[in-house]
Each structure stands twice: as C-alpha cells, then as structure tokens.
Amino acid sequence: MYKDDSLTLHMDLYQINMMQVYFNQGIHNKKAVFEVYFRQLPFKNGFAVFAGLEHIVNYLENLTFSETDIAYLKDLGYPKDFLDYLANLKLELTINSALEGDLVFANEPIFQDRKSVV
C-alpha cells in the first residue's frame, strides 16, 4: 500500500481516458446525467435487493486524486494540464438512487448522478 492509497484509480483506465477527451474538448464542465445499472441478475432471480448506498455516497464525497495517483498517471503519459485539473478536482453532483432495501431489476437505473462530465 502507498501512504496515500485511495480508491480513486480502482477503475478501468477507459474512464480516465474519457475524462481526458472531455477535458481536451473543453466540455469537462458541461452538465450530464450518468446512470448505473446491471444487465443480468445473479442466480436467475427476478430481482435484487439494493444495498450499499452509504458506501457509494461516502466514496463520491471523498473522491480525490492523491499525489500517488497523479504520479502514476504521469508515468502513463497523461499531460500536465490534465493532471493539474485532476489534482484539484472537486465533485459537485446530485444523486438520485434506489433506497436501501428497495427491489431493483436488470437494465433499470438504480443510481443516477447529475454533474459535470468530468
């Protein structure tokens, strides 16, 4: 573990690449809606029970790119202006979500956030 290990980079680098595209195109502050859903239910059930909202909210409220995160992305070749932007990123978003214990179904949004593209 690194001294400032964060969960921020526990994602596919595709997400970072798309953030860079939005940044390069100058649309990173444009408002957008993102939805989270799942395609298939486990165990061939007809529904699932939603749980973990507190963890999601806590993650989003504390999402920052640590010095180690930025150093790693620098080693991958991301440009300085983009890395500076990520180092200072502060999320401002609105969350709409299923409630703890709600029944949720495949291919239907269970979580939605409204924020800038990046």
Task: Report residues per predicted region.
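Ordered alpha/beta subdomains of enzyme catalytic regions
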Residues: M1-V118
